[in-house]
Amino acid sequence: MTDHTPALQRPATRTARLSAIEQALLTRIVTSQSQLSQILADQGIEVTQATLSRDLDEIHATKTRLADGTVAYAVGKQNIDEHPASNPDAKTEQQISRVLSGLVTSVAAARNLVVVHTPSGAAQYVASVIDKQPIEGVLGTIAGDDTVMVICSEDDVAKRRAQWLLDVASKA
């Protein structure tokens, strides 16, 4: 499957660098700081080993042994077999399903957008959950009080993501 997500343009800030590091650890199996440094360099982010080490500490990244014995960096609390890059679709769906099953009241695609309605006050939480997951073709979200707009890279991606969100939200 080809990733239709355009490369993100990131400002040269510490916050953007931390975000790029976290996203790399969520979407790939990263086994060394030099590998992570190269991933960041490919995105136009130059970082020293000392800075990278401090950044990994700051985002609470840890080295975890995966089921196949590989030692890789991970962020957040993850079980030994559950590095997100090992099975991104199942892991993403499971995490999102827990939240969306009780909070999504309707979903619709409109061009390259997916409009998600929630109960009053829940939209920002739903958007945050979507933003934290590596979902192919999703560029980001905007949330109000009871509505989330999911911005997709293309119209057909929005249609697929709308159906996927509806399916995931329907699981109880």
Swiss-Prot record:
UniProt keyword terms in alphabetical order: Amino-acid biosynthesis, Arginine biosynthesis, Cytoplasm, DNA-binding, Repressor, Transcription, Transcription regulation
One record GO biological process: protein complex oligomerization
Primary localisation category: cytoplasm
GO molecular function: arginine binding; DNA binding; DNA-binding transcription factor activity
Pathway in which the depicted protein is active: Amino-acid biosynthesis; L-arginine biosynthesis [regulation]
Gene3D superfamilies assigned to the protein according to its UniProt record, in alphabetical order: 3.30.1360.40, Winged helix-like DNA-binding domain superfamily/Winged helix DNA-binding domain
Listed transmembrane segments: none
Pfam (any one): Arg_repressor
Record localization: Cytoplasm
One GO term describing the cellular component: cytoplasm
Family statement drawn from the similarity comment of this UniProt entry: Belongs to the ArgR family.
Protein task: Regulates arginine biosynthesis genes.
PANTHER family: ARGININE REPRESSOR
Protein name, entry field: Arginine repressor
Species, as recorded: Bifidobacterium adolescentis (strain ATCC 15703 / DSM 20083 / NCTC 11814 / E194a)
